[in-house]
């Protein structure tokens, strides 16, 4: 331990690629037919396989990456089918209909938190990992806006609630705590 009243860290940010390039022109071992076969397997993922806020987010992320690969390979049919699946599922989570019992968010006033139901990995009982769970949904929203410009106009308010639940930057936010999941080292 060192004694002091402050410290400083500095990291260099090198940027993030939104997607990797199509490898056909960069690798002799690359086999497009293998990739098309994998796309076919993933594009037919049924909604019945999906389970809870965490695992469903992971599956949406897998579909997002597959749609990006299909797009790079000019497999527009597969890309659009996957986008439709992502859109259907994401919008189902972002809405509530009377008597709906699954795939929804609700606000718990006692805990000042959004809860996804069905919840996974203690997201409801321990109020943990919202930045992971909601991060998948936020990523899916960014993906939707990239491929369906204007999507955010209809759904942005709900996406902003997810962002605020995980990391509200407003110290006076009436719904969520300030920087719930903030880590200066993350």
Predicted features along the sequence, with ranges:
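Inter-helical turn/loop segments and adjacent helix faces that build the functional surface
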Residues: 70-77, 144-154
